A protein has these predicted regions:
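Short, flexible active-site-adjacent loop segments at beta-strand->alpha-helix junctions, enriched
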Residues: 122-123, 207, 327
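C-terminal active-site-proximal or functional interface alpha/beta core segments in diverse enzymes
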Residues: 318
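Active-site nucleotide/adenylate-binding loops and adjacent lid/helix of ATP-dependent enzymes
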Residues: 2-9, 14, 22, 107, ...
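Conserved metal-phosphate-binding beta-hairpin within the catalytic cores
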Residues: 135, 311-313, 321-323
Length: 329
């Protein structure tokens, strides 16, 4: 009996790539090998695709093998990085990063490589309808929601509006636009938008996963509110007083946290009009700016969020279900 070739797409460029990587490994391990042939299809930071050699599947995180150690710049503080932290790479430079990790393929080759796509990709390019549209173009069946439902599910603002119009019970919601927030000279004034929502409330990015950039506000603490909105927009602000109060080791740990896509804003990021790619570079720039007596430095992730959604806190028990549609329907 010919085994069904299951392409497990995992990794990707989103903030949730580590969750995706771990999920892909779980699927790879648990597929019934008597019926299926699992093919690990790793999507790198730039959207390139390769059949990943099996030994890399069992690394603790993506940063443990990609980018490969020979491409890593020297770091006196032991910073771990993702491939995009190497700078603005040409396509050929991107290819060189993956040459020793597996077999590089094009998405157009997938119909000849797999029979079914098991999608473990998270966030942008994974759950927003893009990969789904491409797979449908190549007539490859895949797991999960279709194009439209994926796109709607990814944008929480549109999702809430459609649910409300369809008669579903939804919590009270207010939305803050990034451009309006950045242009305002009085961000404290935005807290008046929370009157209809009440407290406690949840502040989260409109186009990210359910665990990314989220804060819970218990009361109308203005400073906590501003911090929560900045967090959801992936903006970090630090004052000279805060910076100078830290030891050098504490500054290093702060840089590591801010540079981490899972708990910080991630890099590359912008300070004024300068693009910062590497944590070591960020450390040096902050030392320079605060040495020049800058009062507050704002660091904004290049992978920006356009909207922040604030909604009433829901109490209850979460649940999920899987709906399987028969081929005939």
């Amino acid at each position: 009996m010919n085994k069904l070739k299951i392409g497990i797409l995992f990794g990707g460029s989103s903030r949730e790539r580590e969750v995706s990587f771990a999920g892909g490994r779980t699927v790879y391990d648990n597929l019934d090998k008597t019926l299926f042939e699992p093919i690990p299809l790793f999507v790198d930071s730039f959207g390139n695709l390769l059949i990943l050699d099996w030994q890399f599947i069992y690394k603790g995180s993506i940063r443990d093998f990609y980018p490969p150690s020979e491409f890593l710049p020297e770091s006196t503080r032991g910073f771990q990085i993702y491939a995009e932290n190497l700078g603005s790479l040409t396509h050929q430079e991107q290819i060189r990063l993956t040459m020793k990790l597996g077999t590089r393929i094009e998405f157009a080759q997938l119909p000849d490589v797999i029979d079914f796509a098991f999608l473990c990709l998270h966030g942008s390019d994974g759950e927003d309808g893009r990969i789904q549209g491409m797979l449908e173009y190549y007539r490859i069946p895949y797991s999960g929601s279709g194009i439209l439902s994926s796109a709607i599910g990814m944008n929480k603002v549109i999702q809430k509006e459609l649910m409300k119009k369809s008669g579903f019970n939804v919590p009270e919601v207010t939305v803050i636009n990034r451009s309006e927030w950045l242009a305002s000279s009085n961000r404290k004034s935005f807290i008046k938008n929370l009157k209809s929502v009440g407290f406690p409330c949840v502040v989260k990015a409109a186009n990210q996963g359910s665990s990314i950039g989220i804060s819970v506000l218990k009361n109308n603490d203005v400073d906590a509110f501003i911090h929560a909105v900045n967090k959801s927009l992936f903006i970090c602000e630090i004052s000279r007083t805060e910076w100078n109060s830290m030891t050098f080791d504490a500054k290093t740990e702060w840089i590591k946290k801010v540079s981490d896509i899972r708990e910080g804003i991630g890099l590359p990021a912008k300070i004024n009009n300068r693009t910062i790619y590497h944590p070591e570079e960020l450390l040096g720039v902050l030392i320079q700016l605060f040495g020049e007596m800058e009062d507050i430095v704002s660091i904004a992730a290049m992978e920006a969020e356009t909207e922040v959604i604030i909604e009433s806190f829901i109490t209850g028990k979460e649940f999920s279900c899987i709906v399987i549609t028969m081929e005939s329907r």
